Amino acid sequence: MRDKDLHEKGLEMGGKIYGKDGYKGLVERVQKYDDELADYLVENAFGQVLTREGLDLKTRMLCNVAALTALGIETLLRSYINGALNVGATEAEIREVLIQMHLYAGWPRCLNAFSVFEQLLEDRGK
């Protein structure tokens, strides 16, 4: 069952991270699988977890970049690096997160993450 307040909060947060069109596309992709799953994504991940107190949004996004690098999930990694840049993370901060990950995730995942990052920067025109 949809929680309207959390849903609105989640939509607002997703728009802040990915831009309204980018976030709308994410939600629509998940809705293809299941409407309730899309609501859960919006309300839980974006409406509850990413809006908690204790860490600012940029720091949360950098934590997500680190986790996705360690897990080797490159498709989501690109999206989260882009989101981190959108909420104020610098290229230097992202590079340092990726470098830090070689200690815990290994060289192959670190280098794969750098490839994702470099391609994203190229696509963003940098």
Identify the function of each model-found stretch.
Residues M1-L57, C110-K126:
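Acidic, glycine/proline-rich low-complexity segments that act as flexible tails and inter-domain linkers
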Residues E74-A92, L111-S115:
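Extended intrinsically disordered, low-complexity coil regions enriched in Ser, Thr, Gly, Ala
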Residues E93-F117:
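Preference for long, well-ordered alpha-helical segments
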Residues R60-L68, L98:
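Short, structured motif recognition centered on aromatic/hydrophobic residues
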Residues L55, L71-T75, G106-P108:
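Short helix-coil transition sites and intra-membrane helix breaks within transmembrane domains
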Residues E53-K58, G88-A92:
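Structural motif
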Residues D39-V42, L71-L77:
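Short acidic alpha-helix initiation/capping motifs at coil-to-helix transition points
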